[in-house]
């Protein structure tokens, strides 16, 4: 019990020191740096070239979907690495657990693939058009 508290205490101390280090560095830099904003400093910087257009560019939503899928599988690798280092000690039960974990992620990938989220150019849907009604011809008489 004391060993567990000691381990958590170590993690807590490192967490607090990390937060103090980041906040302290931020506050120190904010107090010591000069703040002289002008028009040139507040303008958009594009590699030394004059800015063209707005800085707000619309990106295709497909970039977001691809990035999310990449992050999901990147995190999967992060979870698999510790398992792979102790695989022989954990035995068959851990192998089954990892296969279930990977299977769930593969099912998610297949679902995204079947749904068409991985297709960059989506086919346009074939929407049937309404048939045109025959035009009525007036008999030349007016209703007035």
From Swiss-Prot:
Main location group: membrane
Location in or out of the cell: Cell inner membrane
Residue ranges of the TM segments: 8-28, 63-83, 90-110
Pfam family, one: Oxidored_q4
EC number: 7.1.1.-
GO terms of molecular function: NADH dehydrogenase (ubiquinone) activity; NADH:ubiquinone reductase (non-electrogenic) activity; quinone binding
GO cellular component terms listed in the entry, alphabetical order: NADH dehydrogenase complex; plasma membrane
Entry keyword set: Cell inner membrane, Cell membrane, Membrane, NAD, Quinone, Translocase, Transmembrane, Transmembrane helix, Transport
Membrane topology, from the record: Multi-pass membrane protein
Taxonomy, superkingdom: Bacteria
Subunit description: NDH-1 is composed of 14 different subunits. Subunits NuoA, H, J, K, L, M, N constitute the membrane sector of the complex.
Family the entry assigns: Belongs to the complex I subunit 3 family.
Stored HAMAP family: NDH1_NuoA
Function summary: NDH-1 shuttles electrons from NADH, via FMN and iron-sulfur (Fe-S) centers, to quinones in the respiratory chain. The immediate electron acceptor for the enzyme in this species is believed to be a menaquinone. Couples the redox reaction to proton translocation (for every two electrons transferred, four hydrogen ions are translocated across the cytoplasmic membrane), and thus conserves the redox energy in a proton gradient.
Stated name of the protein: NADH-quinone oxidoreductase subunit A
Gene from which this protein is expressed: nuoA
């Amino acid at each position: 019990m004391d060993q567990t508290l000691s381990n958590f205490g170590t993690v807590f101390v490192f967490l607090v020191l990390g937060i103090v280090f980041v906040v302290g560095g931020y506050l120190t830099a904010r107090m010591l740096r000069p703040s002289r904003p002008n028009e040139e400093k507040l303008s958009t910087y594009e590699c030394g070239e004059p800015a063209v257009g707005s800085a707000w560019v619309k990106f295709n939503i497909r970039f977001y979907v691809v990035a999310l899928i990449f992050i999901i599988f990147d995190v999967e690798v992060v979870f698999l690495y510790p398992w792979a280092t102790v695989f022989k000690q954990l035995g068959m039960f851990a192998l089954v657990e990892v296969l279930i974990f990977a299977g769930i992620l593969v099912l998610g990938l297949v679902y995204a693939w079947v749904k068409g989220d991985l297709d960059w150019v989506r086919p346009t849907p074939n929407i049937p058009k309404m048939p045109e009604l025959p035009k009525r011809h007036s008999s030349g008489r007016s209703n007035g």
